[in-house]
């Protein structure tokens, strides 16, 4: 939770905004809207520990819980109208309706093998972004490679059948399943697989009907 994080890191609360679903903050140059999220699903369920683990690296520590019941999503809109959606968590049934018709220029979306690609693709259709950049997916293979027991703990038998090749989690098969789902459900959106340690510049473009976009 934010209180545990601020206490642990000894962060001044002067510039900390504790946000909840439905909040909206207007600043001089940006507007931020908050949408409630979920991070409480895996194959065996998620349960709060009876007591917190003192080891801050543990998933059962107060910090390791990562605010699973407090997860929030953010739509950030600049004064020029350009907008970015930051989304993480799980594709629970409420999410597509919470985020319906936001139409951000850029959607930075959490990919997880615990999600179903078609459910994810449908959510993207409801959101209606121009460009999708996935995040989180690149930590999945290192996590499973370092702790294989999590494959059974976090994934269903069907998910393991799709994404495990020769006993190892296959990141390419995983990401491709979601890219294909986006192409099927929301062909107007483009999913970019960006590389680590590179800068990318995005700009606006226009196009007359039947012509190529002009910068």
Task: Show the residue positions of the predicted features.
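Active-site neighborhood of phospho(di)ester-bond hydrolases with catalytic His/Asp-centered motifs
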Residues: 1, 18, 85-90, 106-112, ...
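Binuclear metal-ion centers of metallo-dependent hydrolases, dominated by the metallo-beta-lactamase
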Residues: 5-24, 121, 125-215
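Core dinuclear metal-dependent hydrolase active-site scaffold
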Residues: 19-102, 196-215
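A conditional alpha-helix N-cap/helix-loop micro-motif detector
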Residues: 67, 113-114, 171
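A short, acidic, amphipathic alpha-helical segment used as a generic capping/interface helix at domain edges
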Residues: 94, 115-121
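Local beta-strand N-terminus motif with an aromatic residue
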Residues: 103-104, 129
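Glycine-rich nucleotide phosphate-binding loop and flanking beta-alpha elements
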Residues: 114-115, 140
């Amino acid at each position: 939770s934010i209180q545990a994080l601020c206490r642990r890191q000894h962060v001044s609360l002067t510039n900390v905004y504790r946000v909840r679903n439905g909040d909206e903050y207007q600043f001089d140059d940006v507007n931020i809207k908050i949408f409630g999220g979920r991070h409480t699903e895996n194959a065996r369920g998620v349960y709060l520990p009876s007591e917190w683990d003192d080891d801050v690296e543990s998933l059962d520590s107060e910090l390791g819980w990562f605010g699973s019941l407090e997860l929030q999503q953010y739509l950030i809109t600049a004064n020029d109208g350009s907008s970015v959606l930051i989304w993480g968590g799980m594709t629970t049934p409420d999410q597509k309706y919470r985020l319906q018709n936001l139409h951000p220029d850029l959607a930075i979306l959490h990919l997880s093998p615990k999600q179903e690609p078609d459910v994810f693709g449908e959510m993207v259709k409801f959101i209606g972004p121009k460009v999708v950049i996935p995040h989180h997916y690149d930590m999945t293979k290192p996590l499973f490679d370092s702790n294989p027991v999590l494959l059974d703990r976090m994934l269903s038998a069907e998910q393991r059948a799709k994404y495990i090749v020769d006993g190892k989690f296959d990141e390419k098969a995983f990401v491709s399943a979601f890219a294909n789902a986006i192409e099927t459900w929301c062909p107007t959106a483009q999913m970019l697989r960006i590389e680590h340690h590179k800068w990318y510049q995005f700009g606006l473009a226009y196009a007359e009907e039947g012509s190529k976009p002009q910068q």
